[in-house]
């Protein structure tokens, strides 16, 4: 008996741990398929075996990292474990940061010192935008305060020696394997599988190698001018020149010259069979030469150009230009992911990419609201005619005839069950089109199975992923490198905030003490109803009501988020505010959102988790969170993004947006809250802890008497376990919803007292396996 109890306890603990760190879609995360082809070098890690560790676990790097004489003038520390630390107060910070964003993953970026980490995937992304192995090692040596450890040099060479050397280019609708290294092409052609993929002429002989020469600009962007930072001349003025070592000074002077000069590149290529592209890509990955996908859209004469251009009023911000420069080079488009904060203008980046390629474009979002907003963005920023935009959702199915830009959702394309006749016709049309560009919005949310389904259903030459939070709790996000492409650019949240491109947000965690009656029940109950008890805590309700009243007096626009539908309805109905959740119709949603934007009498709305992503509400400047999804870092960042859009007439020095997370004290919610804040803290945000809201006692608030609190408690206790569960959003991939759920019930439930209906289903006999049934009995059943 003891063993069984212990096993049950272990099972419960594992479930609890899983819930704390889970994401909405982590079960079917990218890379769960063991057949996914990934270069073996991608799994390599920096070797730390030579590092001494003292009795407290601290690492001693003194012997491996001798300081240079002029170390105070250099901005980087490169540790033997692959972590790089950057001084944000260095005079050459702008240049060093641009270089580190290209070669490493950001770990933490507070005010004064930033932390990055070298990974195989980040180095793969670096070579994909044109950096060579020698460039990376040379720049690191020059910028580092110490000698760069040999292990780091070996790791960089291992990961970059073959990456980025070979490209798959589509020219005149013919596929070519291209490289600027003739020896690599010869090495690939010695492989029998690749020789089989090579195109042959009518006599059965392999086509000749093609040698081309073209001019291109340096892959390193001139960060200073593009990011609003100091130019080289300003950094190297007479006063500052003494602070910068001569080799760094000469290096940046040379870097500016390289930026202005065009360099000549000679490439060797051979044509391959179109039907064997997938096999070719897998074989090249196996040979440690992964193919970088590039689309020569200017020379694509088969697919017609579409009539689209940016309006003169569309002015790109410096960081948006920089991200697009990483995507477009030498007149070609690279596939990859661009990471920008919520509210920083990801949609404009997508529209500009479509205007640059000027081929048929397919945009995929994660909700019907997202589809409507993308259509509005295309009409706002580009010259495209309304008749050329086609929407494909469950509510809106525009006729695709003469369409240049199609906008749909992942669930519509990945739908596997029977469709209506009209939807089937649109799907057939989507499949037959050859798309120049596919824009994947909120790219972090899609599981691998859905990716493969979407990517095999529609054919696109170039794929651009857009997201604000390239994080997942299961660390499978890195597999997007080979599903879409490498990370092309990632912006610094704090820099954008300081430059006024996004709002300056005051983040606060408000601690709400549990009322004695609620806490007594919370300790006693072990079911999911505990979630309802700390969400419906009367003191949390009062804090929420006080904050709404306070900010409505300031004419602020307030969004209140709740993952739990029971709590959402109770709060909204009690406070007489409009609310949006899963079953709310599309028409009602748009009406509520339009009123919130333009009606001065509607200043507060309540939204469930359907509003986590793709809700464009630039007017909102206050967000209150009353319940959330476990310890999800991504959800916290996405919700902060609802108030991140730059405000009109804002002063950069003052806080102009507020993010409140209401937490019931001494409950599991406090542990979840700490975990949720990790991503935002890593971006440089700080959370202020408020234990008492000043002026709350003077306000006339609900649940101020024991009787009212007792009535609320009885209502919560009368709720079912189903009410304690989070909302399941329709079309949400990888959610753990199923058709059946196990929960405690009562006999009154069986008779329909709480709107529950007891039903039994019997599977059809015709569907039962009958291969082992004797033929004689089969005849009797007919």
Swiss-Prot record:
Subcellular location: Nucleus
SUPFAM superfamilies cross-referenced by the UniProt entry: P-loop containing nucleoside triphosphate hydrolases
PTMs per UniProt: Phosphorylation on Ser-751 by CK2 controls the 5'-excision activity of ERCC1-XPF endonuclease; phosphorylated protein inhibits the excision activity and thus NER. Dephosphorylation reactivates the 5'-excision step. Phosphorylation has no effect on transcription or the 3'-5' helicase activity.
Enzyme category, top tier: isomerase
InterPro entries listed in its UniProt record: ATP-dep_DNA_Helicase, ERCC3_RAD25_C, Helicase/UvrB_N, Helicase_ATP-bd, Helicase_C-like, P-loop_NTPase, XPB/Ssl2, XPB/Ssl2_N
Superkingdom to which the source organism belongs: Eukaryota
Motif (Nuclear localization signal): 6-18
Family named by the database record: Belongs to the helicase family. RAD25/XPB subfamily.
Protein name: General transcription and DNA repair factor IIH helicase/translocase subunit XPB
Lineage: Eukaryota, Metazoa, Chordata, Craniata, Vertebrata
Gene this chain is encoded by: ERCC3
